[in-house]
Curated annotation (Swiss-Prot):
One of its GO terms (cellular component) is mitochondrial inner membrane. Pfam families: RNA12, RRM_1. It comes from the Eukaryota. Its main location: mitochondrion. One of its GO terms (biological process) is mitochondrial genome maintenance. SUPFAM superfamilies: RNA-binding domain, RBD. It comes from Neosartorya fischeri (strain ATCC 1020 / DSM 3700 / CBS 544.65 / FGSC A1164 / JCM 1740 / NRRL 181 / WB 181) (Aspergillus fischerianus). This is Mitochondrial escape protein 2. Residues 227-319 form the RRM domain. The keyword Transit peptide applies. It is found in: Mitochondrion inner membrane. Residues 356-869 are mitochondrial intermembrane. Belongs to the YME2 family. The gene is yme2. Plays a role in maintaining the mitochondrial genome and in controlling the mtDNA escape. Involved in the regulation of mtDNA nucleotide structure and number. May have a dispensable role in early maturation of pre-rRNA.
């Protein structure tokens, strides 16, 4: 049995963090004399106190015996021996003692598993045991040492000093006086040759043992093992001189430890002392074995060491390789991270931006792919001659919109003329929802226009999350490839970089920046599309790009921005970037920009982008009764001609005029009624269905749903307008009268604008000043009347309004009573306060009379509610 003498029991505990830091020393034996403590402290620090010293011990020193060695006898060091190699860095050998170095017993390549950056002085042995696998051979360090030494070898192991970075350990032993160290080494090597040991972490390489013939230095400096060694030649004493060993001598000394790749001597003209040489092994483990066995070895004179001998001092020489580059990159994040961000941006601009511009051009020119193809043109002619199908031509009007376009032909002509002019301003087509804005622009005014692109703001604004918004915006213009999913990952990288270097690295881009990239690439593609005509027209070759764009407004593409300011209250980032980009297109003569919007406040954001311009505006309203009738009749005539439905008799359409008058001239409502008539309903039945549907939407949106913080109106305010509009003779209310009413005295104009934005009402202005309030669309007046016919709902909403008025009067009376109390507390009643007191009393009297009146109405309404079932 091998008797292992523990080196941990009486050793000091050195607690340290990584690198050079101040240390705390706690002695395992509390009975040391103070003088001995001072000696130990001075020896370990090697400098005046306080000082900063490197950590000199790799193993933490709170002692725990290895659990695997249940049959091993432990001994204690004396206090004089407790700090032997901890303070000096050397293992002292006495008579009949020897030292071996065993390699490949620790996973040197897996140190990150054993010891992380926050591990401090955590025990390597404990870490090895946590990843230990006893079921495999040679999985435990102490078992390996037991198996290395033959059982018949009469030696006693006294101490094991691990060298984890080098994957090995020093084994100190005692031997009988009649046994030679060389014989012990030979016996151990013979045993390993017959019984090779392969650890679990490196099953392809065997454990090797060599005798230590030098005086190794046990250090814990940040010197990583390397296959390249620097061998310095030192004299054995200050007055002696060292020999410059030649290559043959170095080869003879170091070749037993492994394959040598190269030996490089110090240049002869170098003045650096002491002299040195580089010995490079084929593997780091050979270099580690040579360093630990040969460090401190004195080369005698007969072997070329000079008259007094030459002492070898060996250390690792780091090679310039990928690991060093990696270490440098990881240790300089303030430089590396911004450089990586810049490289990423450069790659994006160099590689992806031209691709994205190309795909955007395809999107802009997609409508002309068949028209510009000669083969497709020939096929179209042949098909037309055969009268089989009209490929590429418009046939009859399936929706019956001809009557509406005839009524709005003036607006269409005006819009087309604006596109031929060189005016640096926006074109705005404004109208309520369902008024046919998109159809008028795309299907009529731009039907024969060459290049156009449509951006639907509703799809972008309704997307959830920045990544979805970016993806929607990119799909609108054909911007690809787009890596919207990378934005979240880049945000985490930026957050980590901010924690490391204190500032963001710029990997992630905000929604604002991403949209700017998309619109900028789109502007580049639009400009290239326009300038393509310049090659065909040589007479303008002398003009610059800007002059050519200004001289040919008819060649510019058209950008149609639909649903502008849709749901703008949630976020304005999308609209801010679109407006800014559109202003750049217009000012740079790159494209014509047409905004389609239902929001009456469109002028405010557009004026910020073009502050000195007057917008070209087309306002679409509801069509007249005559046009509406013609639209419905044309729609029904087309369906009957197509054979889808039977023609309707005149008596079935006798009530059509009255129904259209009730429904109003909104195109979507007229089209819905026509579809219901096609399905077999009478005009009156179709209108009643539309009214019921509108009434349900009113109840859901304005009266019955719980009020939210974002909502700018109350149920009582919405009901007040609904009831007043239903009772009005001409369906209109005075704007000023509503603003001065009790329910709208506070922020009344803001509330009315919010209700207009929600399409409950519409506000008509004269010379820019609000004048009248009407329903949001004509059919809503009939829906308002239907809602007010519900006695239970009407009584409940009126009761809520009366309750609100009573509470308001009670608050007013409370304020008046406080003022009267204050005036009554005066020691004398000045004559000047008589009128004020009388005025306050009159206000209290008036408010009390109102409360009495409201309470009578409240009692009546409560009676109605109780009678309703």
């Amino acid at each position: 049995m091998i008797d292992v003498i523990s080196r941990y029991q009486a050793s000091p505990l050195i607690e340290s963090t990584l690198g050079y830091q101040s240390i705390t020393i706690i002695f395992g034996n509390a009975h040391l004399q103070s003088s001995k403590k001072n000696v130990i402290l001075a020896a370990m620090m090697r400098t005046r106190i306080p000082g900063l010293v490197p950590r000199i011990c790799q193993t933490p020193l709170p002692w725990k015996p290895p659990t695997q060695l249940t049959r091993v006898r432990y001994a204690r060091w004396s206090t004089s021996h407790a700090v032997s190699w901890f303070e000096t860095g050397h293992i002292d050998l006495k008579e009949n003692e020897g030292l071996l170095f065993i390699n490949n017993i620790f996973p040197s390549k897996l140190q990150w598993l054993l010891r992380g950056p926050l591990g401090g002085m955590r025990s390597y042995e404990e870490a090895v045991k946590r990843i230990d696998r006893p079921q495999l051979a040679a999985s435990d360090t102490f078992q390996i040492i037991q198996r290395v030494v033959p059982k018949n070898l009469n030696i006693q192991v006294k101490e094991v000093v691990p060298r984890f970075r080098e994957g090995g350990a020093f084994v100190k032993y005692t031997r009988p006086s009649n046994v030679n160290d060389a014989d012990i080494e030979a016996s151990i090597k013979e045993n390993l040759k017959e019984h090779p040991i392969r650890p679990w972490f490196n099953p392809f390489q065997e454990v090797q043992v060599c005798r230590v013939i030098g005086r190794p230095w046990i250090e814990d400096l940040y010197r990583l093992p390397s296959p390249r060694l620097k061998v310095a030649f030192h004299p054995v004493s200050p007055e002696a001189s060292a020999a410059d060993l030649n290559t043959e001598t170095l080869y003879t000394l170091f070749r037993p430890y492994g394959k040598i790749r190269d030996i490089e001597k110090q240049p002869s003209d170098s003045k650096v002392t002491p002299r040195y040489a580089f010995v490079e092994f084929s593997r780091p483990k050979y270099a580690g074995m040579a360093k630990n066995c040969m460090h401190g070895f004195t080369v005698p004179e007969q072997e070329g060491g000079g008259k007094s001998g030459t002492r070898l001092k060996i250390k690792y020489e780091r090679k310039i390789k990928l690991s060093m580059i990696k270490d440098w990159l990881l240790s300089h994040p303030r430089i590396v991270i911004p450089v990586l961000a810049a490289l990423l941006a450069a790659i994006t601009v160099t590689i992806f931006d031209p691709m994205r511009t190309f795909f955007i051009k395809l999107k802009i020119k997609s409508t002309l792919q068949t028209e510009e193809n000669g083969v497709m043109q020939w096929i179209r002619k042949q098909v037309n001659k055969a009268n089989i199908i009209y490929f590429g031509r418009k046939g009859a009007d399936p929706r019956g919109l001809t009557a509406i376009w005839e009524d709005r032909q003036e607006d269409i002509t005006r819009l087309q003329s604006w596109l031929m002019e060189n005016v640096e301003t926006f074109i705005v087509v404004h109208g309520p929802r369902g008024s046919g804005k998109r159809e008028l622009v795309l299907d009529r005014a731009l039907v024969d226009y060459k290049y156009k692109i449509v951006i639907d703001c509703k799809q972008i604004q309704d997307a959830r999350g920045d990544s979805a918004k970016i993806a929607r915006a990119a799909s609108q213009v054909g911007y690809r490839p787009v890596f919207s999913w990378m934005n979240s990952i880049s945000s985490f990288i930026d957050l980590a970089a901010q924690g490391m270097i204190g500032t963001k690295a710029g990997f992630s881009e905000t929604l604002d920046a991403q949209l700017s990239n998309i619109w900028q690439n789109t502007a580049t593609a639009l400009k290239k599309v326009t300038l393509e005509h310049r090659k065909k027209n040589h007479k303008d070759s002398h003009l610059t790009d800007e002059e050519y764009l200004e001289a040919h407004p008819e060649l510019r593409p058209v950008v149609v921005i639909d649903n502008y300011l849709h749901n703008a209250s949630e976020s304005s980032v999308v609209y801010d970037k679109i407006t800014e980009w559109a202003a750049g297109l217009t000012a740079g003569n790159i494209a014509h920009v047409i905004f389609l919007t239902t929001d009456v406040s469109y002028a405010k954001p557009l004026s910020k982008a073009l502050p000195n311009s007057v917008f070209r505006t087309i306002t679409l309203g509801d069509c007249s009764l005559e046009v509406g009738r013609k639209f419905v009749v044309n729609h029904l005539a087309y369906e009957s001609k197509d054979g889808k439905t039977q023609p309707r008799r005149a008596e079935e359409l006798e009530d059509l005029d009255a129904c259209i008058e009730t429904l109003g001239g909104r195109v979507t409502d007229l089209e819905f009624m026509a579809h219901r008539i096609e399905a077999g309903e009478t005009p009156r039945g179709a209108v009643n269905r539309i009214i019921e549907q509108s009434a349900s939407e009113i109840l859901k949106m304005f009266l019955l749903t719980p009020e939210t913080i974002e909502q700018s109106w109350t149920h009582e305010q919405a009901w007040y307008l609904i009831k007043r509009l239903a009772e009005s003779k001409d369906g209109a209310l005075s704007y000023n009268e509503i603003v001065l009413s009790e329910l709208f005295k506070e922020n009344g104009e803001i509330t009315l604008r919010a209700l207009e934005h929600a399409e409950l009402i519409s506000i008509a202005a004269v010379n820019g000043c609000p004048q009248t309030i009407r329903p949001g669309k004509p059919v809503l007046r009939a829906a308002f009347k239907k809602v007010t016919e519900n006695k239970a709902l009407s009584s409940r909403m009126d009761l809520a309004i009366i309750t609100q008025k009573i509470n308001k009067e009670n608050k007013s009376i409370g304020k008046y009573e406080e003022e009267l109390s204050l005036l009554g507390s005066l020691p004398r009643q000045p004559r000047e306060l008589t009128d004020r007191i009388q005025w306050v009393l009159n206000k209290v009297y008036s408010s009390q009379n109102k409360i009495a009146k409201y309470e009578k109405e409240s009692a009546y309404l409560q009676k109605i509610l109780r009678s309703e079932h």
